[in-house]
Amino acid sequence: MHSPNKFTSGPKQFLESEAITSYADAAVVVVPIPYEATTSYRKGCEHGPEAVLEASDQLEAYDEELGTSPCHDLGIYTCAPLADSNKHPALAGDAMVTEVCDGIAPFVEDGKFVVAIGGEHAITTGVVRAMQRGTSEPFTVVQIDAHGDMRDKFEGSCHNHACVMRRVLELGLPTLPIAIRAICQEEADLIREKNIPVFWAREMADNPNWINEAIASITTQKVFLTIDMDGFDPGFMPGVGTPEPGGLGWYEGLNFFRRLFQTKQVIGCDLMELAPVRGSVVSEFSTAKLAYKLMGYWGESQRKKL
Protein backbone atom coordinates (compact mmCIF):
# COMPACT_ATOMS: atom_id res chain seq x y z
CA MET A 1 0.00 0.00 0.00
CA HIS A 2 1.11 3.53 -0.73
CA SER A 3 1.98 5.51 2.37
CA PRO A 4 -1.20 7.13 3.78
CA ASN A 5 0.88 10.29 4.22
CA LYS A 6 1.06 10.51 0.42
CA PHE A 7 -2.60 11.53 0.22
CA THR A 8 -4.46 14.61 1.40
CA SER A 9 -8.05 14.37 2.55
CA GLY A 10 -10.56 16.82 1.16
CA PRO A 11 -12.04 19.74 3.13
CA LYS A 12 -15.41 17.98 3.01
CA GLN A 13 -15.86 14.23 3.55
CA PHE A 14 -18.63 12.03 2.20
CA LEU A 15 -21.12 11.37 5.03
CA GLU A 16 -18.74 13.01 7.51
CA SER A 17 -21.58 13.52 9.99
CA GLU A 18 -21.65 9.73 10.45
CA ALA A 19 -18.07 8.55 10.13
CA ILE A 20 -14.65 9.86 9.11
CA THR A 21 -12.20 7.11 8.20
CA SER A 22 -8.45 7.26 7.59
CA TYR A 23 -7.08 6.27 4.20
CA ALA A 24 -5.47 3.14 5.62
CA ASP A 25 -8.73 1.94 7.17
CA ALA A 26 -11.05 2.81 4.28
CA ALA A 27 -12.18 0.32 1.64
CA VAL A 28 -13.84 3.07 -0.42
CA VAL A 29 -12.20 6.26 -1.71
CA VAL A 30 -14.41 9.08 -2.94
CA VAL A 31 -12.64 11.31 -5.47
CA PRO A 32 -14.19 14.75 -6.14
CA ILE A 33 -13.26 16.07 -9.60
CA PRO A 34 -14.81 19.54 -10.08
CA TYR A 35 -13.72 20.01 -13.69
CA GLU A 36 -15.80 21.78 -16.32
CA ALA A 37 -14.52 23.13 -19.62
CA THR A 38 -16.66 21.88 -22.51
CA THR A 39 -20.29 21.66 -21.40
CA SER A 40 -22.44 22.83 -24.28
CA TYR A 41 -25.84 23.67 -22.77
CA ARG A 42 -26.60 24.14 -19.08
CA LYS A 43 -23.44 24.94 -17.09
CA GLY A 44 -22.49 24.27 -13.49
CA CYS A 45 -21.21 20.70 -13.21
CA GLU A 46 -17.93 21.92 -11.70
CA HIS A 47 -20.03 22.60 -8.60
CA GLY A 48 -21.42 19.07 -8.60
CA PRO A 49 -18.88 17.34 -6.33
CA GLU A 50 -19.18 19.94 -3.57
CA ALA A 51 -22.98 19.78 -3.73
CA VAL A 52 -22.96 15.97 -3.53
CA LEU A 53 -20.61 15.97 -0.54
CA GLU A 54 -22.79 18.54 1.23
CA ALA A 55 -25.93 16.52 0.47
CA SER A 56 -24.33 13.30 1.72
CA ASP A 57 -24.56 14.57 5.29
CA GLN A 58 -28.34 14.28 5.03
CA LEU A 59 -28.23 10.56 4.17
CA GLU A 60 -29.12 7.86 6.66
CA ALA A 61 -26.07 5.71 7.36
CA TYR A 62 -28.27 2.60 7.56
CA ASP A 63 -29.37 1.14 4.21
CA GLU A 64 -32.78 -0.48 4.65
CA GLU A 65 -32.41 -2.54 1.46
CA LEU A 66 -29.10 -4.07 2.51
CA GLY A 67 -29.67 -4.13 6.26
CA THR A 68 -26.23 -2.62 6.92
CA SER A 69 -24.50 0.73 7.38
CA PRO A 70 -21.91 0.78 4.58
CA CYS A 71 -20.04 3.82 5.92
CA HIS A 72 -19.30 1.91 9.14
CA ASP A 73 -18.79 -1.51 7.54
CA LEU A 74 -16.50 -0.36 4.73
CA GLY A 75 -14.98 2.96 5.76
CA ILE A 76 -15.14 5.88 3.33
CA TYR A 77 -12.23 8.24 2.71
CA THR A 78 -12.66 11.39 0.61
CA CYS A 79 -9.49 12.69 -1.01
CA ALA A 80 -8.69 16.28 -1.94
CA PRO A 81 -10.27 17.40 -5.23
CA LEU A 82 -8.47 16.65 -8.49
CA ALA A 83 -8.47 18.81 -11.64
CA ASP A 84 -10.37 21.67 -10.00
CA SER A 85 -11.39 24.12 -12.72
CA ASN A 86 -12.80 26.46 -10.07
CA LYS A 87 -9.17 27.12 -9.10
CA HIS A 88 -7.56 26.42 -12.48
CA PRO A 89 -10.03 27.54 -15.16
CA ALA A 90 -7.45 27.26 -17.95
CA LEU A 91 -6.70 23.56 -17.28
CA ALA A 92 -6.64 21.86 -20.69
CA GLY A 93 -8.37 18.57 -21.41
CA ASP A 94 -5.22 16.49 -21.91
CA ALA A 95 -3.68 17.86 -18.71
CA MET A 96 -6.92 17.12 -16.85
CA VAL A 97 -6.93 13.51 -18.05
CA THR A 98 -3.32 13.04 -16.93
CA GLU A 99 -3.96 14.60 -13.51
CA VAL A 100 -7.03 12.42 -12.95
CA CYS A 101 -5.25 9.24 -14.05
CA ASP A 102 -2.16 9.91 -11.95
CA GLY A 103 -4.28 10.90 -8.96
CA ILE A 104 -6.56 7.86 -8.99
CA ALA A 105 -4.13 5.11 -10.04
CA PRO A 106 -2.54 4.76 -6.55
CA PHE A 107 -5.98 4.14 -5.03
CA VAL A 108 -6.65 1.38 -7.55
CA GLU A 109 -3.21 -0.13 -6.93
CA ASP A 110 -3.99 -0.16 -3.20
CA GLY A 111 -7.17 -2.15 -3.81
CA LYS A 112 -9.57 0.66 -2.90
CA PHE A 113 -13.01 0.88 -4.48
CA VAL A 114 -12.98 4.27 -6.20
CA VAL A 115 -16.12 6.39 -6.54
CA ALA A 116 -15.28 9.46 -8.63
CA ILE A 117 -17.71 12.38 -8.64
CA GLY A 118 -17.64 15.00 -11.39
CA GLY A 119 -17.60 17.33 -13.09
CA GLU A 120 -18.06 16.84 -16.81
CA HIS A 121 -18.05 13.42 -18.43
CA ALA A 122 -14.71 13.97 -20.20
CA ILE A 123 -13.15 13.18 -16.81
CA THR A 124 -14.00 9.49 -17.27
CA THR A 125 -11.13 9.03 -19.74
CA GLY A 126 -8.65 9.68 -16.94
CA VAL A 127 -10.56 7.48 -14.49
CA VAL A 128 -10.63 4.57 -16.93
CA ARG A 129 -6.92 4.96 -17.68
CA ALA A 130 -6.25 4.71 -13.95
CA MET A 131 -8.31 1.51 -13.81
CA GLN A 132 -6.27 0.08 -16.67
CA ARG A 133 -3.06 0.95 -14.88
CA GLY A 134 -4.24 -0.82 -11.74
CA THR A 135 -5.54 -4.06 -13.26
CA SER A 136 -4.04 -6.44 -15.79
CA GLU A 137 -7.36 -8.08 -16.72
CA PRO A 138 -9.76 -6.77 -19.38
CA PHE A 139 -12.92 -5.00 -18.30
CA THR A 140 -16.07 -3.60 -19.86
CA VAL A 141 -17.13 0.01 -19.39
CA VAL A 142 -20.87 0.07 -18.69
CA GLN A 143 -22.21 3.52 -19.58
CA ILE A 144 -25.45 4.97 -18.23
CA ASP A 145 -26.18 8.02 -20.35
CA ALA A 146 -28.77 9.90 -22.37
CA HIS A 147 -26.19 10.53 -25.09
CA GLY A 148 -23.76 8.40 -27.06
CA ASP A 149 -20.71 10.55 -26.24
CA MET A 150 -18.90 8.84 -29.13
CA ARG A 151 -17.97 11.78 -31.36
CA ASP A 152 -14.35 11.91 -32.44
CA LYS A 153 -14.17 15.66 -31.80
CA PHE A 154 -16.67 18.28 -30.78
CA GLU A 155 -16.17 22.03 -30.89
CA GLY A 156 -12.52 21.41 -31.77
CA SER A 157 -11.68 19.21 -28.78
CA CYS A 158 -11.06 15.47 -28.57
CA HIS A 159 -11.51 15.71 -24.78
CA ASN A 160 -14.98 17.23 -25.02
CA HIS A 161 -17.66 15.68 -22.84
CA ALA A 162 -19.35 14.51 -26.06
CA CYS A 163 -16.27 12.44 -27.00
CA VAL A 164 -15.49 10.51 -23.82
CA MET A 165 -16.74 7.08 -24.92
CA ARG A 166 -14.85 7.39 -28.21
CA ARG A 167 -11.67 7.83 -26.14
CA VAL A 168 -12.64 4.78 -24.05
CA LEU A 169 -13.14 2.69 -27.19
CA GLU A 170 -9.68 3.78 -28.36
CA LEU A 171 -8.26 2.29 -25.15
CA GLY A 172 -9.32 -1.10 -26.50
CA LEU A 173 -12.16 -1.64 -24.04
CA PRO A 174 -15.64 -2.99 -24.80
CA THR A 175 -18.50 -0.70 -23.84
CA LEU A 176 -22.17 -1.18 -23.02
CA PRO A 177 -24.22 2.02 -23.44
CA ILE A 178 -27.55 1.96 -21.58
CA ALA A 179 -30.54 4.38 -21.62
CA ILE A 180 -29.27 6.12 -24.75
CA ARG A 181 -31.81 8.40 -26.42
CA ALA A 182 -29.84 11.04 -28.34
CA ILE A 183 -27.00 10.52 -30.85
CA CYS A 184 -25.63 12.20 -33.96
CA GLN A 185 -25.13 10.62 -37.40
CA GLU A 186 -21.42 10.09 -36.75
CA GLU A 187 -22.23 8.09 -33.63
CA ALA A 188 -24.93 6.06 -35.40
CA ASP A 189 -22.39 5.09 -38.06
CA LEU A 190 -19.80 4.12 -35.44
CA ILE A 191 -22.33 1.99 -33.53
CA ARG A 192 -23.10 0.03 -36.71
CA GLU A 193 -19.44 -0.22 -37.74
CA LYS A 194 -18.24 -1.45 -34.32
CA ASN A 195 -21.41 -3.45 -33.58
CA ILE A 196 -21.72 -1.74 -30.19
CA PRO A 197 -24.57 -3.34 -28.17
CA VAL A 198 -26.57 -0.22 -27.33
CA PHE A 199 -29.60 -0.47 -25.04
CA TRP A 200 -31.89 2.27 -26.32
CA ALA A 201 -34.16 3.94 -23.77
CA ARG A 202 -37.23 3.68 -26.04
CA GLU A 203 -36.75 -0.09 -26.38
CA MET A 204 -36.00 -0.58 -22.67
CA ALA A 205 -39.34 1.06 -21.83
CA ASP A 206 -41.18 -1.86 -23.48
CA ASN A 207 -38.81 -4.65 -22.45
CA PRO A 208 -39.15 -5.91 -18.86
CA ASN A 209 -36.23 -8.30 -19.49
CA TRP A 210 -33.69 -5.64 -20.44
CA ILE A 211 -31.66 -6.01 -17.24
CA ASN A 212 -31.05 -9.71 -17.87
CA GLU A 213 -30.24 -9.03 -21.51
CA ALA A 214 -27.84 -6.20 -20.68
CA ILE A 215 -25.89 -8.23 -18.13
CA ALA A 216 -25.79 -11.25 -20.45
CA SER A 217 -24.21 -9.07 -23.15
CA ILE A 218 -21.18 -8.22 -20.97
CA THR A 219 -18.32 -10.44 -22.12
CA THR A 220 -15.83 -9.72 -19.30
CA GLN A 221 -16.06 -10.54 -15.61
CA LYS A 222 -14.70 -7.14 -14.58
CA VAL A 223 -16.72 -3.98 -15.14
CA PHE A 224 -16.21 -0.25 -14.67
CA LEU A 225 -19.44 1.71 -14.28
CA THR A 226 -19.68 5.27 -15.60
CA ILE A 227 -22.89 7.16 -14.92
CA ASP A 228 -23.81 10.42 -16.60
CA MET A 229 -26.64 11.63 -14.40
CA ASP A 230 -28.64 12.61 -17.49
CA GLY A 231 -29.12 8.88 -18.04
CA PHE A 232 -31.88 9.14 -15.44
CA ASP A 233 -35.36 10.55 -15.92
CA PRO A 234 -35.07 14.34 -15.52
CA GLY A 235 -38.35 14.24 -13.60
CA PHE A 236 -36.29 13.44 -10.49
CA MET A 237 -32.85 14.34 -11.86
CA PRO A 238 -33.28 17.82 -13.38
CA GLY A 239 -29.81 19.04 -12.42
CA VAL A 240 -27.93 18.00 -15.54
CA GLY A 241 -26.53 19.79 -18.56
CA THR A 242 -28.96 18.42 -21.14
CA PRO A 243 -32.09 16.91 -19.53
CA GLU A 244 -33.31 14.54 -22.25
CA PRO A 245 -36.87 13.25 -21.70
CA GLY A 246 -37.17 9.63 -20.63
CA GLY A 247 -34.35 7.63 -19.08
CA LEU A 248 -33.94 5.33 -16.11
CA GLY A 249 -36.30 5.46 -13.17
CA TRP A 250 -34.85 5.35 -9.65
CA TYR A 251 -35.76 1.79 -8.72
CA GLU A 252 -35.20 0.52 -12.25
CA GLY A 253 -31.66 1.84 -12.02
CA LEU A 254 -31.07 0.39 -8.56
CA ASN A 255 -32.32 -3.03 -9.68
CA PHE A 256 -29.85 -2.99 -12.55
CA PHE A 257 -26.93 -1.81 -10.44
CA ARG A 258 -27.48 -4.39 -7.71
CA ARG A 259 -27.71 -7.19 -10.26
CA LEU A 260 -24.56 -5.90 -11.93
CA PHE A 261 -22.63 -5.97 -8.66
CA GLN A 262 -24.04 -9.42 -7.84
CA THR A 263 -23.04 -10.99 -11.15
CA LYS A 264 -19.90 -9.09 -12.18
CA GLN A 265 -16.79 -7.75 -10.47
CA VAL A 266 -17.28 -3.98 -10.49
CA ILE A 267 -13.82 -2.44 -10.10
CA GLY A 268 -14.88 1.19 -9.72
CA CYS A 269 -17.46 3.75 -10.76
CA ASP A 270 -18.02 7.40 -11.46
CA LEU A 271 -21.02 9.74 -11.34
CA MET A 272 -20.72 12.67 -13.72
CA GLU A 273 -22.43 15.79 -15.04
CA LEU A 274 -24.47 16.81 -11.99
CA ALA A 275 -25.12 20.55 -12.30
CA PRO A 276 -27.00 21.78 -9.21
CA VAL A 277 -30.24 23.68 -9.71
CA ARG A 278 -30.57 26.85 -7.67
CA GLY A 279 -33.30 26.53 -5.07
CA SER A 280 -33.51 22.74 -5.29
CA VAL A 281 -31.49 19.95 -3.67
CA VAL A 282 -33.21 16.95 -5.26
CA SER A 283 -30.51 16.27 -7.86
CA GLU A 284 -27.49 16.41 -5.57
CA PHE A 285 -29.27 14.48 -2.81
CA SER A 286 -30.30 11.78 -5.29
CA THR A 287 -26.74 11.62 -6.63
CA ALA A 288 -25.31 11.32 -3.12
CA LYS A 289 -27.80 8.57 -2.31
CA LEU A 290 -26.94 6.74 -5.53
CA ALA A 291 -23.22 6.92 -4.74
CA TYR A 292 -23.91 5.48 -1.28
CA LYS A 293 -26.10 2.71 -2.75
CA LEU A 294 -23.27 1.74 -5.11
CA MET A 295 -20.84 1.59 -2.19
CA GLY A 296 -23.29 -0.65 -0.38
CA TYR A 297 -23.74 -2.95 -3.37
CA TRP A 298 -19.98 -3.24 -3.69
CA GLY A 299 -19.70 -4.09 0.00
CA GLU A 300 -22.39 -6.75 -0.40
CA SER A 301 -20.45 -8.28 -3.29
CA GLN A 302 -17.29 -8.41 -1.19
CA ARG A 303 -19.06 -10.16 1.70
CA LYS A 304 -20.34 -12.85 -0.63
CA LYS A 305 -16.75 -13.67 -1.60
CA LEU A 306 -15.90 -14.58 2.01
UniProtKB/Swiss-Prot annotation:
Effect after changing E187A: Retains 50% of activity
Annotated positions binding Mn(2+) 2: D145, H147, D228, D230
Binding site for Mn(2+) 1: H121, D145, D149, D228
Cofactor note: Binds 2 manganese ions per subunit.
Alphabetized UniProt keyword annotations: Hydrolase, Manganese, Metal-binding, Spermidine biosynthesis
GO biological process, one term: putrescine biosynthetic process from arginine, via agmatine
Disruption phenotype: Deletion of the gene leads to substantial accumulation of agmatine, CAPA and APA, and lack of spermidine. Mutant exhibits arginase activity, as determined in cell extracts, identical to that found in the wild-type strain. The mutant lacks any agmatinase activity.
InterPro entries hit by this protein: Agmatinase-rel (IPR005925), Ureohydrolase (IPR006035), Ureohydrolase_dom_sf (IPR023696), Ureohydrolase_Mn_BS (IPR020855)
CDD domains attached to this UniProt entry: Agmatinase-like_2
Enzyme class, first EC level, given as a word: hydrolase
Molecular-function GO terms, alphabetical: agmatinase activity; aminopropylagmatine ureohydrolase activity; metal ion binding
EC number: 3.5.3.24
Pathway: Amine and polyamine biosynthesis; spermidine biosynthesis
Family, similarity comment: Belongs to the arginase family.
Name of the featured protein: N(1)-aminopropylagmatine ureohydrolase
